[in-house]
Amino acid sequence: MRFFRKTSLYLSLFLYFFLYESSMAANTIRRGESLRDGINHKPLVSPQKTFELGFFSPGSSTHRFLGIWYGNIEDKAVVWVANRATPISDQSGVLMISNDGNLVLLDGKNITVWSSNIESSTTNNNNRVVSIHDTGNFVLSETDTDRPIWESFNHPTDTFLPQMRVRVNPQTGDNHAFVSWRSETDPSPGNYSLGVDPSGAPEIVLWEGNKTRKWRSGQWNSAIFTGIPNMSLLTNYLYGFKLSSPPDETGSVYFTYVPSDPSVLLRFKVLYNGTEEELRWNETLKKWTKFQSEPDSECDQYNRCGKFGICDMKGSNGICSCIHGYEQVSVGNWSRGCRRRTPLKCERNISVGEDEFLTLKSVKLPDFEIPEHNLVDPEDCRERCLRNCSCNAYSLVGGIGCMIWNQDLVDLQQFEAGGSSLHIRLADSEVGENRKTKIAVIVAVLVGVILIGIFALLLWRFKRKKDVSGAYCGKNTDTSVVVADLTKSKETTSAFSGSVDIMIEGKAVNTSELPVFSLNAIAIATNDFCKENELGRGGFGPVYKGVLEDGREIAVKRLSGKSGQGVDEFKNEIILIAKLQHRNLVRLLGCCFEGEEKMLVYEYMPNKSLDFFLFDETKQALIDWKLRFSIIEGIARGLLYLHRDSRLRIIHRDLKVSNVLLDAEMNPKISDFGMARIFGGNQNEANTVRVVGTYGYMSPEYAMEGLFSVKSDVYSFGVLLLEIVSGKRNTSLRSSEHGSLIGYAWYLYTHGRSEELVDPKIRVTCSKREALRCIHVAMLCVQDSAAERPNMASVLLMLESDTATLAAPRQPTFTSTRRNSIDVNFALDSSQQYIVSSNEITSTVVLGR
């Protein structure tokens, strides 16, 4: 028995090492070995099975090619082809290392159809080996030195892979270009190529045919390509490109791309139809999805508006115009471009006047610049251009330096945001005319503002004198009010803690459990409502910071006479928030009503509102994922208290990021209950003819039909959740193809790319599991049907539990946040009213209190 056990052990070890050696050898071919096509053909496989190299036939073709493709996924996209111009007609191909040390591909007649074509520096080529790596690189090297002799990365076809080095030599003009396939099923060299232009500042160029430019990326500034304005938004597209510096011994520099997440499978490809795409593998959908493509619009087409013309994407079509100081050469024919109206001083040979510069902002800089890297001062750059009569424009870009344009300005494009500033050289009369017009407009506006300001100041002083004259306790005869001056002592305050009735425009409001402040006390606390104490303005009116005599900091919301909100909202806050006590709801300390003054007094929030941090690029990093998730949980608990656990069942109806305040410890506090409604114990839904809320946060049934319920708040919470995770406003994408943040989130969710929605500032450090769960929950909350949305108890459970099962959400269709589209679609009778606040115009709560 012992003999058999030993024999079995030895046999197992032998088989293990044999299989191990076989698997290790599966990615290499040594001298004397070969890879053969045919029925029993087995491709070479990289160590982690990421890539394979072997023979294939594209589509329905019978031609055979040697290529590299992805190995461990269903869609085995081909990324490199050896014999793309010389296919083999049958399955007789053989890959081997020849006697001269070259890697060769032979057909059935032993004819070389492809070779690595290198000159051997040694007579002993027996130590050469070729292997496929997990990067997709096919490398011929020597076993004793492991030095690459030849590699496929230096001879690309149509695909740029991560870690591939794209060589460009500004001195010799050499560059490695990626050439498209001829068709979808024909790998032979096509009509389009993509590469780095070796002249000027490095930029990626897409050529058609014999080097006719079709698209370019704009100059590389060591961080982004300046002609791709959304590059800073596409984080995974941006953070990975690098340009080696300084040049190597041959004068070459190299572009590389290393993604922030190495586990993501991605590739850049130039297609046979003349577009460049970045494709990513979607494991959920089991397919490649397009992440970005160029050219992406009409204005991206190279030099669409001709020389000295500029293209602007207004609406869906690109609109051409001449830059200021130029006129069309041939009206209606933009291919001929524009020409200068007034010659420059040096062209007229006169000594009177001086050429000036007109600045164009947020533009794609023209092509064919002359870099002056040693000039980094704006004045030096300007002077360099002025001294050269051929200079038409200059620009100073961080990471590049000064750039001069001595030729025609071509391929100009106007962006909504991003881009660079270009200084156009014009005759003094052209700039002077433009400057005079601007000065006239500015002077007119300033005079108007000053006159309005003087009038407003006089009116305010008159009104303040009138108000303060009767602003002490019990002296106002127009109202029936009992007021306590709470700045004196706690004893005085407690004496008025019982039920106090005040009359507001003939309507009795019971302030049970809510102290009432005198106007005098608040005026002292806020230093007579001085401008320095103003924290902000909302739909209600201005909000002031104050300090009571006992040292407590307060925030005073003062109802403005021109407020979009009025007495009903004022009453609502008094009635509702005074009865609510929860750590995630803002605390109302009291109110004041004297004469025409109506004020609410809150606890002061030193960290202002959530949007103060969330939408400010300089402050986004201060709220990391741990803090954001804590804020999300706090808001959810506050809503659950309102919907289920408070003495009153309350629907907020205006939940948004600016109505979430942050205390000293960054705990979230839901605020602004002016639009809230009380629900009965068994009431599930109500209808209103007075639709209130904020565009982008209103649920479909509420905005369209006036129906509201606790599920209306759930919808708003879903939008808020997407904003917190992404760091984007819900209205920030309304001009994009997705129409809204909800539409963009749904697109990423269905394509298995939800992690791309996460704020780039926290994407690397956040809990991916929690972030994806938050996005999934948000998608459930913003479903069109209120019945299909979860309640807040379920939402909180899904957020806090790793084991909770999350249902598949239905596609939301009500995703547009455009004001005009919502107005058009309101299907309500003429008696219905709309009270709508907007994050872009005003906020119903201040930035801080």
From Swiss-Prot:
Q: What class of enzyme is it?
A: transferase
Q: Where does ATP bind?
A: 535-543, 557
Limits of the EGF-like domain: 295-332
User: Looking at the record, which segments are called CaM-binding?
Assistant: 618-635
Question: What membrane topology term does the record carry?
Answer: Single-pass type I membrane protein
Identify the keywords attached in UniProt to this record, alphabetized: ATP-binding, Cell membrane, Disulfide bond, EGF-like domain, Glycoprotein, Kinase, Lectin, Membrane, Nucleotide-binding, Phosphoprotein, Receptor, Serine/threonine-protein kinase, Signal, Transferase, Transmembrane, Transmembrane helix
- Name the residues that span the membrane: 439-459
PAN domain span: 346-427
Signal peptide, first to last residue:
1-25
Please give the name of this protein.
G-type lectin S-receptor-like serine/threonine-protein kinase B120
Report disulfide bridges, numbered on this chain. Answer: 299-311, 305-320, 381-402, 385-391
Q: Name one Pfam family in it.
A: PAN_2
Example GO molecular function: carbohydrate binding
Whichever gene encodes this chain, its name is: B120
Q: Which InterPro entries does the protein's record reference?
A: Bulb-type_lectin_dom, Bulb-type_lectin_dom_sf, Kinase-like_dom_sf, Pan_app, Prot_kinase_dom, S_locus_glycoprot_dom, Ser-Thr/Tyr_kinase_cat_dom, Ser/Thr_kinase_AS
Q: Might you give the EC number(s) for this enzyme?
A: 2.7.11.1
Q: Which residues lie on this side of the membrane: Extracellular?
A: 26-438
Reaction(s) the record says it catalyses? L-seryl-[protein] + ATP = O-phospho-L-seryl-[protein] + ADP + H(+); L-threonyl-[protein] + ATP = O-phospho-L-threonyl-[protein] + ADP + H(+)
The listed locations are:
Cell membrane
CDD domains in UniProt: B_lectin, PAN_AP_plant, STKc_IRAK
- State which ranges are Cytoplasmic (membrane side): 460-849
- PROSITE patterns this protein is in? BULB_LECTIN, PAN, PROTEIN_KINASE_DOM, PROTEIN_KINASE_ST
Cellular component, GO annotation: plasma membrane
GO terms in the biological process aspect are: recognition of pollen
Boundaries of every Bulb-type lectin domain copy: 26-153
Q: Which residues are glycosylated?
A: 110, 191, 210, 230, 273, 282, 333, 349, 388
The entry assigns this protein to a family as follows: Belongs to the protein kinase superfamily. Ser/Thr protein kinase family.
